[in-house]
Design a protein with these regions (language model features):
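Structured cytosolic domains appended to multi-pass membrane proteins
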Residues: 1-150
């Protein structure tokens, strides 16, 4: 958002920038992207949809269905007004944080992980690590599943 900050009596324009991570294996990424788009709209912010391709999730290692879903999500992000970015890295969290710093991102939006606990323990929990390591960024974890009516 364009806001005015007073620093020593001077006024300066600050543009809010938001980043959302796009995974190749998340079935609810489309919903996450729509939420990020709404948040960016409310803040009048620029936003980025960033996919980090790791060696284990390279194009040749993920299934056709996951790859098509990833491309669909990248297209959805672009249609919603995001600048889409595809990076390669061994370390998803470090790549996201480095990108955020390079682009002046102040808020990172991620979806709550739905991986089984054993998989998070074995492979590491990207969301938890992002919260722990991105101490200078606001990290917002959003629910991406529809809540059932509890009547």
């Amino acid at each position: 958002r364009e806001s005015i900050k007073r620093e020593g009596g001077h006024r300066s324009n600050v543009i809010e920038r938001i980043m959302v991570g796009v995974s190749s294996n998340a079935s609810d990424t489309g919903q996450l992207l729509r939420k990020a788009s709404r948040i960016a709209g409310q803040l009048n912010a620029e936003w980025f949809a960033v996919h980090i391709e790791t060696p284990s999730e390279s194009v040749k290692n993920i299934g056709t269905r996951d790859f098509v879903a990833l491309l669909d999500n990248i297209n959805v992000a672009s249609d919603l007004g995001a600048e889409t970015v595809w990076l390669k890295s061994d370390d998803v969290v470090k790549a996201l944080i480095d990108f955020a710093h390079d682009k002046g991102v102040s808020k990172v939006i991620v979806g709550r992980t739905h991986q089984p606990r054993w998989r998070r323990w074995l492979k590491g929990d990207v969301v938890a690590r992002l919260v722990a390591d991105a101490t200078d960024l606001d990290v917002e974890i959003v629910a991406t599943e529809e809540r059932e009516d509890s009547r």
